[in-house]
Amino acid sequence: SSAASDVYKRQVHEGGTYDKYTVKDIKSRDWSIVYDGSINCYNANGDRASKSYSVEMNSPVLEYGDIPLLQEVVRALRKAGGVTGPRYCAGTHIHISADDYTPQQIRNLVNIFASKEDFLWDALQVSSARESYYHKMDKQFIEEINRKKPKDMEEIKGLWYHGRMSEQFQHYSNSRYVICNLHSFFQHGHYEIRAYNGSLHAGEVRSQIVLALAISNAAMTKKYCSPHVSQSDNMRYSFRVWLLNLGLIGDEFKNCRTHLLKHLDGDIAWRHPEDGIAARAKLKEKREAERQAARGQRVEPVSEVQELNENVSDENSEPTESECENFEEDEEMGMEMSM
């Protein structure tokens, strides 16, 4: 495709500790393939493979408008025989620039993850095989950052490392293995989201990025985000409402919502499923009454399609079960944000 052609085919083997290969795109940005020893190696046939299969792709710093290019790169990897996913202990790690965050915005950010991490664990189908490489948020850190309400980043840093400040200079600090990694922020100015399973489905990858950016936007724009852990007996409805509150509204984000909701159980249109059952029963009674009246008056009955259109919830922002099958992403983008 024209987007994929934006990445040159010529590779450069730089070698080094991670046996690095790089490919430049037309903007002279490096896309890298590097060794990653944490991956379980299988080939495309599912057979055990050598460590030459133990690699990951690192993109350059991208902006929102680069997502179509990233999607084409993902498709090219899949077409070339690349494999990834929970079985391989592989994940998608997304780094978000946060060098202009205030202490309150960092507090908002970690509170969002602390409050919604149970939802995210289910929605993202977090693999148990990867639990060695990230956990839920540190409850002691969340309690202290909300009790002390730090006003500067150094104080937040002290809370993050629990006073063990030498860890900030260690690349593999144990503090990095959480759903929202601030160790990366203190070292490089960007935090890391580690919750996503690896995927070579371009639509899933886009939905992962869009959710990460929406959470970032909420952390920056909301005055205060509570750490109170969200609970629900209708996860699909509650998670959908949260996505809409994050701004993932309308056709632009419909496909993202579909991917993010497709693993959740529950009634998407009704907070209490029994209300949906009652509403459908009432609609059925209404249909039958109208049919009886139509037969008595010898007129055509109201069509079932018309009845459904008049009585069901607006679908404009609600993915249905059928939309979750054989789905491919749309590629129309709107806003522009840095990643």
What are these regions (language model features)?
Residues 13-63, 76-78, 83, 90:
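Polyanion/phosphate-binding surface patch
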Residues 306, 314-316, 321-339:
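Non-Sec secretion/translocation targeting segments of pathogen effectors
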Residues 5, 66-74, 98-125, 146-153, ...:
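Helical (often loop-to-helix) elements that flank the catalytic cores of nucleotide-handling enzymes
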Residues 250-296:
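Long, highly charged low-complexity segments enriched in Glu/Asp and Lys/Arg with interspersed Ser/Thr
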Residues 29-47, 106-197:
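Aromatic/basic-lined ligand-recognition segments
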Residues 1-8:
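Short, small-residue-biased leader/transition segments that mark boundaries at the very start
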Residues 85, 118-136, 217-234:
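Flexible helix-coil linker/hinge segments at domain or subdomain boundaries
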Residues 3, 85-101, 188-194, 240:
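Histidine-centered divalent-metal-coordination microenvironment in nucleic-acid enzymes
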